[in-house]
Amino acid sequence: MNPNHCADVIIVGAGIIGATCALTLARRGLKVLVLDAGWHGATAAGMGHLLVLDDNPAELALSQYSLRRWRELAPELPPECAYRTNGTLWLAANAEEMAVAHSKYLNLLAHGEACELIGRAALRQREPELRDGLEGGLLIKGDGILYAPAAARWMLAQANIEQRRVRVRDVEGHRVCLEDGRWLSADVVILANGIQATELCPELPIEPKKGHLLITDRYPASVTHTLVELGYVTSAHNASGPSVACNIQPRPTGQLFIGASRQFGTLDPEVEGWMLAKMLKRAVEYMPGLAHLNGIRAWTGFRAASPDGLPLVGQHPQRDGLWLAVGHEGLGVTTAPATADLLVAQLFNEPSLIAAQPYLPQRFLGEPARA
C-alpha cells in the first residue's frame, strides 16, 4: 500500500471550478482532497454572472447546459450564495447592434432559450435608469447571478471532501509535491487553479486577461437585470489591446457591480486609475445616474484564457493521471457544472449530455503519446 496515497482524487484549486468538480466527484462516492494556496483567484474577483453565450456552438452548449445545472442545484444553495435568476439584458445602442440582438434572439430561440426582443420604449420601461436613445435590447430570461465564493465554500464543506491550504509546487501524473517537499498521490489529479496552472504545466496555452471591477454603496434598488452592452462580445474577444464594455449587475444587497475591462500582457494586480476611469466612463454613458453613486471598492482579477476561448477539460494527453479543468476565461462561474460533469463522464467512461470533443486538451497539446 502506498503510504502517500491520500485520496481517490486530488484537486489543485479551490475556486468555483475545483469546488464544483469536488462536489460532483464526492457525490459519486469518491474521496476528494482539495489543495489550494489561498491566493486571491478569479472566483473571488469575478462578478458571478451566470449567462448563456452563443458566440459559437460549443460555447452555447457548455453555457446552456451549465445554467440548467445551476437551476437544479439552486434549492440546495444556502442564502449567502445569493443565487438569483434576474436575466441578462443585452443593450443595443444603434440599429446595427439591434440587428446583432435579433440574430442572437433567433439563434437562442432555436435552441430553446427563453428570450425576448425589447424595443426602444419598452427598454426604458424595463430599466428606467438607462439613457435615452438606446435602440433596444435582448432579454435572456434564464440568466442569473451567484456569489461564487460562498458557493465554492458550501461545496467544499460537503461530505467526502477534505480541503488543505497549501501550495503545490510540482505535479507528476498521479501525484503532487507540496511546498515542504512532501509528495501526495491519488488515482487522479485534477488541475483547476486558473492562471496558476501554467506554473505546474508550462505547456498549457493559458494567457491572463486582467479585469477591473467596482462595487457601489447600498442604494434603493433601481436596476433589475444584469445590463451588458452588445459591444461586450467584441470586447471580450479583442486580442490586440485593452478594452472596456458596459456591464452593470445589481446585487441583492442593493449594491451595483460595475465592469468590465480587459488587458493583456500584465500580471500587475494593482488597480490602474486610467483603466478604471475608462471603464466607469463607459458605464455612465449607458446609465448616467451612476455618476452620482458612491463607489466603495475597486479591485482587479485575472481571467485564464485559452487561444480559442473555450476551456481545456479532460485528460492531459502527455501526462498520465493528470486531468485539466482550466482556461475558462470569464465564464468559469457559469460553466463550472458542465466542466465537472464532462470530467466525471470521462473519468467513469460514461456518455456525456454534451459533446466533450470541443474542450479536450488535445486540440492544443497534441494526441496521447501512446495508443
Model-derived segments and their meaning:
Residues 26-44:
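Glycine-rich FAD pyrophosphate-binding loop
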Residues 61, 90-100, 138-154, 270-275, ...:
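Short beta-strand to alpha-helix junction loop
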Residues 23-27, 50, 81-83, 193-317:
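Active-site substrate-recognition segment that forms the wall
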Residues 284-371:
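C-terminal catalytic lobe of FAD-dependent flavoproteins
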